[in-house]
């Protein structure tokens, strides 16, 4: 049985473990491969190299899932939108400002997305059979925010002002991205992805009304469309920073797994795990500390979530400066907890 899917099958004795950004800059073997290609998007579309770095953390740590090496912005890029990655700056995009800008978006994605699907097929062939393969996409609001802001990690005034002042146009853009995101996830499942994930990194900047319109509704549409084709493929949703709106999200979105950030109280995770599988939520900064702190913080999570529908992960991605030995220690500690804590104290 696929290890990451165990909780979905009612097997909650084993705690599946994988990490967001588990293939990335903290790994020396990743850096070595990454240095061979200057342009980040070219690297994402390189079948051989993306396959190699997807498998690196599996070979090193033996996680229960591999997540395909890609980026949430490959979708708008493949749809013709201008996207670039600047070193030490991050993504830079053409800004979407008016109805006229739809002319830069293609109805059908170009060949670039086919590269992503080739990578999934290649990884699938090389991945040990018990390990799940996760495909993913950015959620519509987050992708739309990048397009409206022209860059990432802003205060989102531009995006929010746009959706307040341009309701019809904002809805049109949202619907376009929603449709293409669903298609992208379906194609990933067709290519061999066992599990799918939606990353909504900027959902936490919205008030309740806009959260419902731009996060909950498009996520529901995507999941329902994917499930029409792949009813048994588990879907993880991560509305990062949703706070109190996580509960509204759980009630209204038919997800299999809810990923949560480190700000969510453990007792809430425990409560929610009666309704949905919960994934999270160790603070990534804990991995920058020492073994005693890692052990202490991890133990608290494992104890609260003991016997619950739970996947161990971080509250966000692994930080680039994370020591590899700390990731190894954490992974081994979770495994040891599983072994020793079935019927005894630990």
From Swiss-Prot:
What InterPro entries does the annotation carry?
UROD/MetE-like_sf (IPR038071), Uroporphyrinogen_deCO2ase_HemE (IPR006361), Uroporphyrinogen_deCOase (IPR000257)
Q: Which GO terms describe its molecular function?
A: uroporphyrinogen decarboxylase activity
Q: Which domain of life is it from?
A: Bacteria
Query: What Enzyme Commission number does this protein have?
Result: 4.1.1.37
- Read off the CDD domains from this record: URO-D (cd00717)
Tell me the residue numbers annotated for binding substrate: 21-25, 40, 71, 146, 201, 316
Chief localization:
cytoplasm
**Disulfide bridge positions per record:** none
* Metabolic or biological pathway: Porphyrin-containing compound metabolism; protoporphyrin-IX biosynthesis; coproporphyrinogen-III from 5-aminolevulinate: step 4/4
Per UniProt, subcellular location reads as: Cytoplasm
GO biological processes: protoporphyrinogen IX biosynthetic process
Task: Give the HAMAP family listed for this entry.
Answer: URO_D
Q: What does this protein do?
A: Catalyzes the decarboxylation of four acetate groups of uroporphyrinogen-III to yield coproporphyrinogen-III.
Homology family = Belongs to the uroporphyrinogen decarboxylase family.
User: What is the protein name for this chain?
Assistant: Uroporphyrinogen decarboxylase
Q: What is the lineage of its organism?
A: Bacteria, Pseudomonadati, Pseudomonadota, Alphaproteobacteria, Rickettsiales
